[in-house]
Amino acid sequence: MQNVVENKIDEACNELARVLKEKNKKYGDSFSKTADEYGNAVLLLRIQDKLNRLKKLLILKENFSGLEESVEDTFLDLAGYAVLSKIYLENKK
């Protein structure tokens, strides 16, 4: 059973890395640029946006008309913002 969980962790982390790299190529480092411009509060705001979306999807069971983002996609984005925040703060040391 442990190997199954470990494999799923590897798969999720690999997917996260792929998505982050793909978006970084597509949009540039907009996350860091926005944080530089508006401060560290941006780090929390991005994460809070995803938490609010999860609340609507999981607790309130609201659907977003026209949006294709699933609960799983939202969790992946949340993890992505956490990773980007970590990198941003490390680079500011």
Language-model regions: role of each:
Residues 1-93:
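Intrinsically disordered, low-complexity regulatory regions
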